[in-house]
Amino acid sequence: MSLDISQFPVLAQANTPNELRQLPQALLPQVADELREFLLKSVGMSSGHFASGLGTVELTVALHYVYNTPFDRLIWDVGHQAYPHKILTGRRDKMHTIRQKNGLHPFPWREESEYDTFSVGHSGTSISAALAMAVAAEKEQAGRKVVAVIGDGAMTGGMVFEAMNHAGDLHNDMLVVLNDNEMSISENVGALNNHLAQLMSGRFYTTLREGGKKVLKGMPVIKEMAKRTEEHLKGMVVPGTLFEELGFNYIGPIDGHDVDALVETMRNMRNLKGPQVLHIMTKKGRGYEPAEKDPIGWHAVPKFDPTQFKKPSTTPGLPTFSQVFGKWLCDIAEQDDKVLGITPAMREGSGMVEFSQRFPKQYFDAAIAEQHAVTLGAGFACEGYKPVVAIYSTFLQRGYDQLIHDVALQRLPVLFAIDRGGIVGADGPTHQGAFDLSFMRCIPNMVIMAPSDENECRQMLYTGYCYNAGPSAVRYPRGSATGATQVEAMTALPIGKGVIKRVGKRIALLNFGTTLASALTAADNLDATVVDMRFVKPLDAELVTEMAQTHDILVTVEENAIMGGAGSGVLELLQKLKMPKPVLQIGLPDEFIKHGSPEEVTHDLQLDAEGILAQINAYLAQ
């Protein structure tokens, strides 16, 4: 159910950016207030990303007010902060459907709206895309402006600086808005700084600056003195030296919650030549006290009542696989101070909060820099340490070359704890862990494990810790564990060996990972054999051979892309052994998996017990 827009009288007049631009500037503060209230109530009704959007309300209003979107290109980095953008671009009546099956996409998405000029979900991509659009705009001579909005967290990624270095060299007209919500230099935010930012972005100052360069071109000593004078003036209020060195003109920082200051500064900057950076200071969770105090805890929320000023209480349930990993990491660190935990800015999501607090000297947050995180682990392994890189499946894609070149090629014993393997649900195609088994399986020297439950996960992590002949990976899903009895004692599993879980006839299900329970349920209806394969690489060739010799049909089950996945490994083995055998591969299809709840997505892809049974029966009927 959508909100009653009559409760928001000014926002009701701005369903599109064009309507927003018809309003007098004096009404923009009220637009921002109503937009924030709408967002608060909307996310409370539907669930979704929360704190980031509250922090970008004034910025979003100012951008769409000053720039002629969608003709002017606006690119959001990652997209957590883009809910206000969706509300102002004709989608407010559908906001209650966001992240839900057949509802609005969780991030800016080109197929959804012409205002979403670039589909996003991973951090650090916006400036590269914006640069390309700026170059295209110059080629077309259409007068189009280009703006990228990026957070301070994403600025830690190497791709960002690669793009800025290139943009500084090409010198096309573009604006990068640095949304800094860490408040690291908050003492510089205020009336004086806003005034100086507007002054430095104004036509008089920039004309004087460019004219001065021409006049002083042949007078290097005076030119250097003038440059230092300007740097001294700017240095009083801006930390922009790095951006200037990359070839950007830097303005700021200014208060990102002062919509009038944002509008005036952006108007001044809109027609500046060359690449520009506008540094704004914002606060995540702005306008909602609990989110301001705990922006990480309120990053994404379930449905809640905003008037209660707290998230709904949840009854303690089964531990998540992330928590199982976190406990194992603490347990092993108690025994071995050579164990090092590495995460690319996913401490909370990966279950490493307790580890970071109890073992701070063994904990390394590499920031949003997956390539660096992987090679950091490689370097530690070279020095005799036991690095454990905790990383989401979808983000390991970003460190693939490092996994091959820096880890596997050197046979370094780095353990990868791969979270969010398989279907993740509401975050959609940018975050589904669909490809890791496929892209790791082809790498020489890798050992890849897929636990069927939390106890097996714990033992596999220990197996990877004990394995010193090369890199290893334990791949587990998002969400709650299965309820298996936890065995505190840690025992290394024999490498490349599976176990038979059910003995049946004719059909053998070779299961990889936490789909085991569904495979067993389906097998009960078929009187089929079920094998918990455990290892994707190396495969248990002896067990696969036995199943092929004693059964008419093999069925592989995995929550990974069928193409190149564990099932493909079984087929390759059978072909190598010259054992022709019908094999049905059950897994993720050759398409990007859309958003929805994990249960909905699993059902639609026929990966639950009912779906597995249906796929097998359909195969038998052919």
Swiss-Prot record:
Protein family membership: Belongs to the transketolase family. DXPS subfamily.
Xref: HAMAP family: DXP_synth
Function text: Catalyzes the acyloin condensation reaction between C atoms 2 and 3 of pyruvate and glyceraldehyde 3-phosphate to yield 1-deoxy-D-xylulose-5-phosphate (DXP).
Binding site for Mg(2+): D152, N181
Originating gene: dxs
Keywords: Isoprene biosynthesis, Magnesium, Metal-binding, Thiamine biosynthesis, Thiamine pyrophosphate, Transferase
Entry's Gene Ontology molecular function annotations: 1-deoxy-D-xylulose-5-phosphate synthase activity; magnesium ion binding; thiamine pyrophosphate binding
Recorded catalytic activity of this chain's protein: D-glyceraldehyde 3-phosphate + pyruvate + H(+) = 1-deoxy-D-xylulose 5-phosphate + CO2
Protein species of origin: Shewanella sp. (strain W3-18-1)
SUPFAM superfamilies named among the record's database cross-references: Thiamin diphosphate-binding fold (THDP-binding), TK C-terminal domain-like
Protein name: 1-deoxy-D-xylulose-5-phosphate synthase
Pathway given in the UniProt record: Metabolic intermediate biosynthesis; 1-deoxy-D-xylulose 5-phosphate biosynthesis; 1-deoxy-D-xylulose 5-phosphate from D-glyceraldehyde 3-phosphate and pyruvate: step 1/1
NCBIfam families for the chain: dxs, PRK05444.2-2
Domain of life: Bacteria
Enzyme Commission (EC) number: 2.2.1.7
Cofactor: Mg(2+); thiamine diphosphate
Coiled coil: none
Pfam family, one: Transketolase_C
Subunit structure, interactors included: Homodimer.
